[in-house]
């Protein structure tokens, strides 16, 4: 074979060996990458779901031990095991059935109310039948606002544990504008009261934000201290300058009707426009964090502050902005309560929404839509708890225990991964591959 023929054959051989852009290796790699991403997303969703399920399993065990009848049956377990198991199972079913009925309403009652409404046009029984669902949405609304606030902080690398205090000062500002200013028309007065609450909460979040950015003071300590200041400020104002009437009770005067967040349905249903405002804010937060340059900078700082600094992000400014946004969203929960539900402010108007928001953000993976879903769960639990206690005799504190167990399992996901063997196969394959390489 001549040299010229060897040279002419060489390019052809090289051309045959080069994989095409759509060759099986690149396609296979792309497919594997997509499968890996989807598997990671699936696990991200699966772990919170299993955390909730496991918390309810723990709750079921506590239900068994919270009834004297079941305890007596278990005392005779070795004599009559089937009775103990049957009574325990029935107590669990009764408790969770009452919980669901209290959260969504009685299906039979709803069906009869709809039938009556169709035949006679009478709406009272229909409204009564759907009242449990309405109450669940009333509880859900402040959860969404406060959960979004904590989630924004998490995305920016900040632990805003001061949502409860921010909620209180927002309620104070909104209720003051709501009752002190008179003569304004409805939309303007309502918006002014809502903005006053947001501004007060933003100011409350600015303080720990600037301390973190300028002095490096940890936001957890600062926000806890700001909580105490907010609580004591509320106590002072409710027993002094803002007290209503004769001063017999520590409450503010009722706000003007022009400052109300309007109800969606007639009484006794209390769900109001704030619920749809909360859903709109969730969509807005998603758009801001994932579709805008400023939102990307917040997520960059939260993911890797050093890399964000090298990329030219102003860390101090983003830190302050994140805390202000987080506090503003939490403050909307307080404004929502006084403008849409209570129409005045009392000492215990919050009932811990700001503290529960930490669990909501963790359960929702700090994603706005995840926060909405977890808020619905907590709202339904809180609404159904009273009926569970009155009908099934299960203590209402069980709901708090279930919520606490959800937090434990979310904060320590390895418990769930180990319990349900999530990711074990992948780890075993990696170990086997490393052993084979050695």
Locate each region found by the language model.
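Helix-loop-helix "hairpin" substructures at the membrane interface of multi-pass membrane proteins
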Residues: 268-344, 368-369
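Transmembrane alpha-helical segments in multi-pass inner-membrane proteins
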Residues: 324-404
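Short, non-helical or kinked segments that cap or interrupt transmembrane helices
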Residues: 68-73, 154-170, 213-222, 342-355, ...
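Short loop segments and helix-boundary regions at transmembrane helix junctions
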Residues: 38-46, 154-162, 183-250, 287-293, ...
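Cytosolic-side transmembrane-helix boundaries in multi-pass membrane proteins
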Residues: 2-55, 60-65, 310-317, 385-438
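Interfacial/capping segments of alpha-helical transmembrane domains
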Residues: 58-115, 241-251
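Single transmembrane alpha-helix segments in multi-pass membrane proteins
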Residues: 62-68, 93-180, 194, 198, ...
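Transmembrane helix-bundle core of multi-pass membrane transporters
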Residues: 98, 107-110, 223, 227-291, ...
């Amino acid at each position: 074979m001549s040299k010229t023929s060897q040279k002419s054959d060489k390019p052809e051989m090289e051309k045959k060996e080069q994989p095409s852009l759509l060759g099986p290796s690149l396609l296979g790699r792309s497919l594997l990458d997509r499968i890996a991403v989807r598997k990671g997303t699936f696990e991200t969703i699966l772990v919170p779901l299993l955390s909730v399920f496991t918390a309810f399993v723990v709750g079921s065990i506590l239900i068994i031990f919270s009834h004297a009848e079941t305890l007596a049956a278990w005392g005779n377990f070795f004599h009559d095991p089937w009775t103990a198991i049957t009574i325990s199972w029935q107590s669990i079913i009764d408790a969770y059935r009452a919980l669901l009925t209290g959260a969504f309403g009685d299906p039979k009652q709803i069906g009869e109310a709809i039938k009556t409404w169709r035949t006679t046009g009478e709406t009272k029984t229909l409204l009564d039948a759907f009242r449990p669902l309405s109450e669940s949405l009333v509880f859900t609304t402040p959860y969404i606002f406060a959960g979004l606030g904590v989630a924004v902080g998490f995305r920016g690398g900040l632990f805003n544990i001061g949502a409860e205090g921010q909620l209180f000062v927002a309620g104070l500002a909104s209720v003051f504008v709501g009752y002190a200013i008179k003569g304004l028309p409805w939309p303007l007065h309502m918006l002014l009261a809502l903005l006053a609450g947001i501004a007060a909460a933003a100011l409350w979040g600015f303080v720990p934000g600037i301390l973190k950015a300028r002095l490096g003071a940890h936001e957890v300590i600062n926000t806890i201290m700001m909580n105490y200041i907010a609580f004591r400020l509320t106590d002072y104002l409710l027993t002094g300058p803002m007290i209503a009437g004769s001063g017999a009770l520590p409450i503010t005067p009722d706000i003007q009707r022009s400052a109300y967040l309007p109800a969606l349905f007639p009484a006794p249903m209390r769900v109001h426009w704030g619920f749809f405002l909360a859903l709109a804010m969730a969509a807005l937060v998603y758009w801001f964090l994932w579709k805008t340059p400023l939102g990307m900078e917040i997520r960059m700082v939260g993911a890797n502050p050093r890399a964000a600094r090298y990329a030219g992000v102003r860390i101090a400014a983003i830190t302050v902005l994140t805390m202000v946004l987080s506090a503003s969203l939490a403050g909307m929960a307080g404004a929502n309560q006084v403008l849409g539900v209570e129409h005045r402010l009392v000492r215990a108007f919050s009932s811990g929404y700001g503290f529960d928001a930490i669990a909501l953000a963790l359960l929702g993976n700090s994603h706005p839509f995840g926060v909405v879903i977890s808020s619905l769960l907590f709202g339904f639990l809180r609404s159904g708890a009273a009926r569970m206690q009155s009908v099934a005799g299960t203590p209402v504190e069980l709901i708090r225990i279930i919520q606490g167990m959800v937090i434990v399992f979310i904060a320590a996901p390895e418990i769930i991964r180990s319990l349900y063997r999530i990711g074990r196969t992948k780890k075993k394959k990696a170990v086997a591959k490393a052993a084979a390489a050695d």
